[in-house]
Design a protein with these regions (language model features):
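Surface-exposed, charge/polar-rich loops and edge strands
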Residues: 1-424
Length: 424
């Protein structure tokens, strides 16, 4: 299939507003579960998910945690400016960023930008009985170093460099966000964030701060379901992909060749890679973010086999890598998933590392050949979205059968909606 010339209009369906779940149901694991197995569709309740999985299988979860990335500042003129954290800039490491005190910098989207032409924004607040002032200063043009300008440019014109300063070196940036940040919820919910979202818009296994959107397939899991998976002998493993706001970016071009995928940052530990090898790279993925992480690993391993001297930055998977590497017949089809993952483990050994830190821009669309993911747990996605393309590629084009069934059987859609288990 000529993937780059896929027309996004071929992946459209009618989604009435009332089918978009504005809030989650009261018990996470009581959501509906659509089961697609070898072309047959049925439905059940999510807490029965373990009954459908092969005993001893490996299941991969994304353990990222959504941060309170939305901050509001009021100018002296009365104008309200929104600063939306997109990606850590200085330091660039997520873990270090949240530990910083006194100063840090982020790449941000700015709401009401036309009202913030110069100067710093300030906000007074209190933490543990201490009064603090947070200031935000935007740097542009000549105020940016060459490296900083390159980082800003990668955002495609929507990101701005913002320096944050606060007057208490005993307070971390994580505490700042907890005090003044607001949890971002998907724009299509068309409502303000509520206190309950702080709990319901996080997975029960979320650990690593960094996402601005939840890996929503995981929202249905409860401790009880996780224990049931263990009882069924499912080998649970976690990876980290920090979900960016680009996950909501609509495809505006007629063909997907014109759509630029966003970059997301991933961390995969040695133990997870060794488990992949043990399971012969046969995986049940929880959510599209886990899919993008795991499938990207294959191409990182291929790159290392071809270029053993490569750095972590060199391992970044570009949008069209899977298609271009396959098209030029450049060894890719001769490299097994196990060989590719072993190459990453060998790379970690050579460099004395316990985890791989890299990034991916991969687009998975019809014409893509899945290398590692064999079963997928996922929610129901927006029409004409890259996530729907990913599902279509997984089901070899049979996505309409799944979505027609969901629409005619009262399933709830999108982030707070119901779930599906897909077995091609």
């Amino acid at each position: 299939m000529d993937t780059i010339h896929i027309k996004i209009s071929d992946y459209n369906y009618d989604l009435p507003d009332e089918r978009i779940a504005k809030f989650p149901i009261s018990q996470r694991d009581h959501s509906k579960l659509l089961v697609y197995k070898h072309g047959e569709v049925s439905d059940d309740v999510f807490f029965h998910l373990p009954d459908y999985l092969p005993k001893g299988a490996m299941m991969v979860f994304n353990n990222t945690k959504v941060i309170q990335a939305r901050m509001h500042f009021r100018k002296e003129t009365g104008a309200l400016i929104e600063v939306f954290l997109m990606e850590p800039a200085a330091p660039t490491d997520y873990e270090l960023m949240f530990q910083t005190s006194g100063h840090c910098s982020w790449l941000c989207m700015i709401g009401n930008l036309k009202k913030w032409k110069e100067g710093s924004l300030k906000r007074d607040f209190e933490i543990k009985g201490h009064q603090l002032t947070l200031s935000a200063t935007m740097r542009r043009g000549n105020a940016l170093s060459t490296e900083a300008a390159e980082m800003v440019a990668k955002g495609g014109g929507t990101n701005y460099w913002v320096d944050f300063d606060w007057d208490n070196e005993h307070v971390s940036f994580a505490e700042i966000l907890e005090a003044v940040g607001e949890l971002p919820i998907p724009p299509y919910l068309n409502r303000k964030t509520e206190e309950s979202d702080k709990t319901t818009y996080q997975t029960v296994y979320s650990k690593i701060k960094g996402s601005v959107a939840a890996p929503t397939a995981g929202l249905h899991f409860t401790d009880a379901v996780l224990q049931d998976l263990d009882a069924h002998g499912i080998d649970r493993e976690e990876v980290t992909l920090h979900v960016g706001a680009g996950t909501f970016k609509p495809v505006k071009s007629l063909e997907i060749e014109g759509h630029q995928m966003h970059t997301e940052y991933i961390v995969v530990h040695r133990r997870s890679l060794e488990k992949l090898i043990k399971h012969e790279c046969q995986v049940i993925a929880v959510g599209t973010t886990s899919v993008r992480t795991i499938e990207s690993l294959y191409y990182m391993g291929v790159h290392l086999i071809k270029h053993p001297e490569a750095s972590e930055e060199d391992l970044h998977v570009k949008q069209w890598d899977p298609y271009e590497l396959s098209a030029d017949g450049n060894l890719v089809d001769d490299i097994t998933p196990v060989q590719a993952i072993q190459a990453i483990v060998d790379y970690l050994d050579r460099n004395g590392l316990e985890a791989l830190h890299s990034s991916t821009q991969i687009i998975i669309a019809p014409g893509y050949t899945y290398k590692i993911v064999k079963m997928l747990v996922t929610n129901f996605h927006q029409p004409q979205s890259t996530l729907l393309l990913l599902v279509s590629a997984f089901l070899h084009g049979d996505w309409k059968k799944v979505y027609d069934y969901a629409l005619s059987h009262d399933f709830r859609f999108l982030s707070y909606g119901d779930s599906s288990l897909l077995i091609p």
